[in-house]
Amino acid sequence: MKKLLAVLVIIGVAAGTAAAGQPPQKQEKQQAQGKVYIPKEVKEPMMAGQAARQARLDIPFSIFKNLFLPAQQAQQAILFFKAKNADLGFAAAVAPQIADATDAAQPKMHARLNLFLQFHTVENGQPVKLIKEIFVPATLEADQAGYDPEAEAWYTIGYPLMPGNYLASLAIASQDLKKIGIQYYELSLPDAKSFTQALDTTPVFFMKGLKQEAAPELTPLLHKGLFAYSVLKITPSIDHVFKVGDALDTFFYIYGVQPKDGGKYDIAIDFEVYEGEKLAIKFAPGAFDNPLVSLPLQLKQTLLIKKGDEERTETRDLPAGDYTFVIKVEDKVSGLKGEKKVPFKVV
């Protein structure tokens, strides 16, 4: 199943794009032709606040992280932001008249917003060249029953960019453009060809959910509680907090590995879990023929139990505590190595 997942993602990346359906070079040409329009009520404050990263909080929100994954020759940049329901303007939806009350659907709350996103290249900490402007109309939905205006949710939007350093300017606006929230976020996307001395990976995350679609998205869309990558809809763990008995469903891509003559890879990976400096779990070494790794790891310890002169082994769930997940990667073709550490918590 996991090998199939890796193949599906690689096919999706090679044959299409992870978000926009066409390479960044073509998108830049369309930008030059003026096919994306940001109204001046939004664009002027976006541009004015870029140099000092001066946020505008008519609609409060915050960009709190980004991920990136390979997309053709580019990198799929994924921005994560969070906002309260009340700040996004949720209101009761007008339901159609239904003759039979038994057919009535659960009443909904809707929020209709316009998102505008700019990417500028960055030199010496300052935005230099506008690479892309994106407009994303969005309608969010929530059940009216149990709706909490103070509840905070997280959202994502992704776009493929060539390697480099960027400033993302994200504006969220009401439909009448009278309320506008603006935030700025700097991100760096690596060049896969630059890893010649050591291996590295994309940011490692742990999956909580996965859904495969029939085709990748042709235009960027706003997603709540998940992100889109090729034909996949992935729900990652945001806080890296797991319950006793949960698995670490890890997902990452390895940079710097070289294929063999037949096109496949020869990658050795050791996975370990540490509690402080103490080794808590050492998983069996893994051999991989693809640089994209998606693998569930059961958080179970094999313990040696001594009672008098008797000894026995017992398998137990990893107990509650703070841990570090360690990934040690070696490319058997080039000899290059790399290591990644990710903190997580079991409760």
Task: State what each model feature region is.
Residues 1-4:
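Positively charged n-region of N-terminal signal peptides that target proteins for export
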Residues 6-15:
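Bacterial N-terminal signal peptides
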